[in-house]
Amino acid sequence: MEKIKKSYLLVAKLKFKYFCLKPYSLNSTTKFILKIIKNKSMLIFN
């Protein structure tokens, strides 16, 4: 369980960097994947 949380935190950090650095260069597929990851991480942390 701890490993899963750490990997989600890492993904969240990467996602945050992507949205800060390149908000307009992400293609729709990447955005879709990040959306799914976001939804799953919300389920885990809430």
From Swiss-Prot:
It is found in: Plastid, Chloroplast. GO terms for cellular component: chloroplast. It comes from the Eukaryota. The keyword Chloroplast applies. Keywords: Chloroplast, Plastid. This is Uncharacterized 5.5 kDa protein in ccsA-rps6 intergenic region.
